[in-house]
């Protein structure tokens, strides 16, 4: 596998992580180093591990992955996005960091949602009979870098907004849009168009 092809693949896989990181950056009032590190690290780690898992599983779940992966990714993103919107519109006062998507279950869900495509790539690479270790490393590093850049870009976008109180709502809407785009890319809406 050529380095150019591998970098192109890594960038393509990092796009979901990048878009979700923008949404997270918009939703956070202020990005701390720990938050940026946690999100970048976890997105990169999951992006690196999923191709390895897919490669190890080989063809055993190939049909499932191709048929249902887009629904799983959409559901995870829609749940987190809906929760972000609900919390932004609620009047409940919460402790700082309680809504932090770079912690706990939210972090795991977002990491899974942005890396499901990498599982399918791992399955594909197993059929090409190539070593998975170098591609997984590159995919993880690129995803981590794009995540960091996306968070910083999202923070800049949030600062430009006139009504920053709606930043988290915008972040939730972006997650929904990403999820719907995943369904669109997989032809779910084609019978209706």
UniProtKB/Swiss-Prot annotation:
Record's keyword annotation contains Ligase: no
Protein name per its UniProtKB record: Putative manganese efflux pump MntP
Subcellular location: Cell inner membrane
Membrane-spanning segments: 6-26, 41-61, 65-85, 107-127, 132-152, 169-189
GO cellular component: plasma membrane
Organism: Desulfotalea psychrophila (strain LSv54 / DSM 12343)
MF terms (GO), sorted A to Z: manganese ion transmembrane transporter activity
Lipid bilayer topology: Multi-pass membrane protein
Superkingdom per UniProt: Bacteria
Alphabetically ordered keywords of this record: Cell inner membrane, Cell membrane, Ion transport, Manganese, Membrane, Transmembrane, Transmembrane helix, Transport
Function: Probably functions as a manganese efflux pump.
Similarity annotation: Belongs to the MntP (TC 9.B.29) family.
């Amino acid at each position: 596998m050529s380095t150019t092809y591998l970098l192109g693949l890594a960038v393509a896989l990092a796009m979901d992580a990048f878009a979700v990181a923008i949404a997270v950056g918009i939703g956070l009032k202020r990005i701390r180093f720990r938050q940026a590190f946690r999100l970048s690290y976890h997105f990169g780690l999951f992006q690196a591990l999923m191709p390895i898992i897919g490669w190890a599983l080989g063809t055993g779940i190939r049909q499932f992955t191709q048929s249902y992966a887009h629904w799983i990714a959409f559901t995870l993103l829609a749940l987190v996005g809906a929760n972000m919107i609900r919390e932004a519109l609620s009047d409940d006062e919460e402790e700082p960091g309680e809504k932090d998507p770079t912690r706990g279950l939210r972090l795991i869900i977002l990491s899974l949602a942005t890396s499901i495509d990498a599982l399918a790539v791992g399955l594909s690479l197993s059929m090409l009979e190539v070593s998975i270790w170098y591609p997984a490393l590159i995919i993880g590093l690129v995803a981590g870098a794009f995540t960091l850049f996306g968070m910083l870009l999202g923070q800049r976008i949030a600062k430009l907004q006139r009504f920053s109180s709606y930043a988290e709502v915008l972040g939730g809407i972006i997650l929904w849009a990403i999820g719907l785009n995943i369904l669109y890319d997989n032809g779910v809406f084609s019978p209706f168009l």
